[in-house]
Amino acid sequence: DGIRDIGVTGVQTCALPISSPRGVVAGIIPSTNPTSTAIFKILIAIKSRNAIVLSPHPSAVKCIAETARLMRDAGVREGLPPDAVQCLTRSALEGTETLMKHKMTAVILATGGIGLVRAAYSSGKPAFGVGPGNVPVFVERSADIAKAVRDILSGTCFDNGTICASEQAVVADTPIAKALREEDRKSTRL
């Protein structure tokens, strides 16, 4: 019962390679959660051995550029090539479109409105798009229920619950649904 590792281990539980570096990642960053999204995209690009170029929303250029600088500097201190993290500093729609269609761009991570996500999907490059949504969280039967409730409340309240990644709905594994509901009621009493 519960979560199983499917597709991660092979015969005799030997690890199988499941990915390889792709090249340059185009990271399109919104204004609604600019720093956390920039950090997340930089980390997943670098952890997967890819370079990343961020294209910030015009109203968040300064904070995204500073976040990219801080992340790049921290990485360089640990041996990251200095050009592995880049950020467009004069953001405009044309720059984002050029980045998405550039011959060196291998994959696009687009976070923003539906128009931006559609543009990423129609760029001719592999793209992962995230737009506005009703974000669910799944609590599995083996979870520490008290910790799960604390984490859900923390995530829901982060940045006043305004980011598209904030938990908006909870889906509970049937065996723990009642206990989860009771813990939530207990934790949210004023």
Residue spans of the language-model regions?
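Conserved small-residue-rich beta-alpha loop and adjacent elements
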Residues: 17-73, 78, 114, 123-127, ...
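Short acidic loop-to-helix transition motifs that present clustered carboxylates
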Residues: 90-94, 114-116, 134
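ALDH superfamily catalytic-core signature
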Residues: 39, 44-47, 117-189
